[in-house]
From Swiss-Prot:
Record-given protein name: Nucleoid-associated protein HPAG1_0033
Principal place of residence: cytoplasm
Role description: Binds to DNA and alters its conformation. May be involved in regulation of gene expression, nucleoid organization and DNA protection.
Keyword vocabulary terms for this entry: Cytoplasm, DNA-binding
Lineage of source species: Bacteria, Pseudomonadati, Campylobacterota, Epsilonproteobacteria, Campylobacterales
Gene Ontology CC terms, in alphabetical order: bacterial nucleoid; cytoplasm
Length: 97
């Protein structure tokens, strides 16, 4: 493969990555903690798009903090795992060329 082909290949990969990122915005990852008392949802690019807190937790600040941290951490992990999978899939496609 010569350098002109490599440039075209890289441009194609950039375009594919942009399309995957755009599509990934529509993917929603939801995590719950405290038996569902706290629920958080992130889109595929890591933006928090929904937060639900059971009313009974409003009187127990410490429990709410613990459940919220747990749900947020799980949500972040799900988004990161999804991003890793996308990257590995792209690398797999690149290796086939």
């Amino acid at each position: 493969m010569d350098f002109s082909q490599l440039g075209g290949l890289l441009d194609g990969m950039k375009k594919e990555f942009s399309q995957l990122e755009e599509k990934n915005k529509d993917t929603i990852h939801t995590s719950k903690s405290g038996g569902g008392m706290v629920s958080v949802s992130f889109n595929g690019v890591g933006e928090l798009v929904d937060l639900q807190i059971d009313d009974s937790l409003l009187e127990d600040k410490e429990a709410m903090q613990i459940y919220l941290m747990s749900a947020l951490n799980d949500g972040y992990k799900a988004v990161e795992e999804n991003r890793k999978n996308l990257a590995f899939n792209m690398l797999g496609n690149f290796a086939k060329l």
